[in-house]
């Protein structure tokens, strides 16, 4: 797993250099797609929400987000609308759900959680019903 404290320490160090510009670019995936407002609200430098995990059999793509969770995410984006999230709203509204792909993604996460000693639902509780069914 990434050592985020170390990574963010390096980000702050690079930001202190006069000849260095730091930007955040989130890779939008099935797990973080509902949390882009957090990036907008907490980015202390320019950011981009322009990278999307996408492709055939790409288990972490938005096709793995079930309708119930999409509705939760969309409700957040509608309630606290920002122009920067227009593409994300469109993805959540229009990309077709694939239950098989979601199951593969959650199995991959469950295997990783076992290896790392972590648990998906500690960070993303909205996935509980799906994660615990495996």
Go through each PLM region and give its residues.
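Radical SAM enzyme [4Fe-4S]-AdoMet core and its adjacent flexible, acidic
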Residues: 1-134
């Amino acid at each position: 797993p990434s050592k985020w404290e170390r990574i963010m320490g390096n980000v702050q160090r690079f930001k202190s250099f006069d000849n260095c510009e730091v930007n955040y670019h989130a890779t939008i995936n099935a797990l973080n797609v509902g949390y882009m407002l957090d990036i907008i609200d907490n980015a202390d430098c320019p950011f981009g929400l322009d990278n999307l995990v996408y492709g055939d059999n790409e288990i972490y793509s938005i096709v793995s987000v079930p309708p119930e969770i999409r509705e939760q995410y969309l409700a957040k984006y509608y309630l606290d609308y920002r122009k920067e999230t227009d593409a994300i709203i469109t993805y959540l509204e229009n990309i077709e759900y694939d239950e098989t792909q979601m199951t593969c993604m959650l199995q991959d996460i469950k295997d990783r959680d076992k290896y790392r000693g972590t648990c998906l639902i500690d960070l993303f509780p909205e996935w509980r019903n799906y994660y615990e069914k495996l």
